[in-house]
Amino acid sequence: MSEPFMFEKPLGMRDVLPNLHSMQRKLGDRVLQEFRLWGYEQVQTPTLEYYETVGKASAISDKQLFKLIDFHGNTLVLRPDMTAPIARLVSSSMKDIPYPLRLSYCSSLYRALQTEGGRPAEFAQVGVELVGDHTASADGEMLLLLNRALIQAGLDHFQVAVGHIGFLNALFLEIFGTVERAELLRRQLYEKNDVGFKEQVKAFGLSSIDEKKLLKLSRLRGNEAILAEAEQLTESAEGKQAVAELRDLWQGLKEGGLTRYMKLDLSLVLHMSYYTGCIFEVYHDRLPRPLGGGGRYDHLLAKFGRPGPATGFGLRLDLLAEAVGKLEVQPKKRCLLYSRERRQEAYRKATALREKGMQVVLQDVAGVDDIDKMSASYEEIVYLIGKTEEGKR
């Protein structure tokens, strides 16, 4: 392996420059404020977790984990997601606080890359977890809150696809009996490869009835009308229960006046394997990939010794910033350029402006090589150079 150049960064790691950093921070603040209004309390978990606990409980594949060894020989991982760490937190430090719990976060996540592929290995995510509530009302709260958070962030023309992993699991079990062949179809659905899905279905050599069911599954996208079709596809109690839960959820969304942002997609599959019920994903025309998603995961907390139902979602701040495109007019950038004899005057003026909430840079003229180039970075320059009009220093 050749030595990296001084300016190179590890695979997938990126610098965030001031304008983008400021935008991501402001968007994160807006989203967190909306979470607070809904009663969600912000928490922070360590960047490093034990591989044997959070690492193995996480739905992120082992090859995507950044692993380290501590001085005692324990294998650690850089935090790959927030759901597993919060499950650990709820089951330990918060074990005496009764359910339901409403928690929020804004944290960096780390996932190792095999190739560059345009994806980051580190990214900031903002999200919520509602722990201890099994009802459809909790699922509805996630979708209502998701919509409000996106609107408050300044996003428009987004769409949320809503599905149910329990429906897919039930249908696949009815047709295949085992999970092996079903996993091949899940991969095609996750990649949204309709052509590959159809080819794989035909390659199985299924009965004409089962083949038609699977091909119809890939077209079950739209409004609540598709739920009647979905109910006819499945014969199991689990499959019909999943459809009933989606119908109940959709009714709640109608009551919240937010179905215009929603579509049902019974073929939806997400990256995380721990989902058990309603799942959803957010799309925007400006983005080549979903900017966030989430769903119900009722079995994860049991791995940490405190069983309980849960649901939640996360949004990537870098993708949210890309989708929003541009925030409202940014604060004016001002600079007080002063010489040494007027330094005290410059300090007073800067303090007065900052007390009014204005952004002000104080710059000693002796520290500037090219005043013209420096001035181009500011919308307003105030020169405090040389003696004052009264001749005072």
Curated annotation (Swiss-Prot):
The UniProt entry's GO CC annotations, sorted and at most eight, read: cytoplasm
Molecular function (Gene Ontology), one example: transferase activity
Involved pathway(s): Amino-acid biosynthesis; L-histidine biosynthesis; L-histidine from 5-phospho-alpha-D-ribose 1-diphosphate: step 1/9
Which domain of life does this protein belong to? Bacteria
**Which keywords accompany this UniProt record?**
Amino-acid biosynthesis, Cytoplasm, Histidine biosynthesis
Its annotated compartments are:
Cytoplasm
Pfam families given for it? HisZ-like (PF21996), tRNA-synt_His (PF13393)
Give TM segment ranges. Answer: none
In Gene Ontology terms, what is a biological process of this protein? L-histidine biosynthetic process
Q: Which family does it belong to?
A: Belongs to the class-II aminoacyl-tRNA synthetase family. HisZ subfamily.
State the oligomer form and interacting partners.
Heteromultimer composed of HisG and HisZ subunits.
Q: What does this protein do?
A: Required for the first step of histidine biosynthesis. May allow the feedback regulation of ATP phosphoribosyltransferase activity by histidine.
Share any extra remarks. Answer: This function is generally fulfilled by the C-terminal part of HisG, which is missing in some bacteria such as this one.
Q: What is this protein called?
A: ATP phosphoribosyltransferase regulatory subunit
Recite the lineage of the species: Bacteria, Bacillati, Bacillota, Bacilli, Bacillales
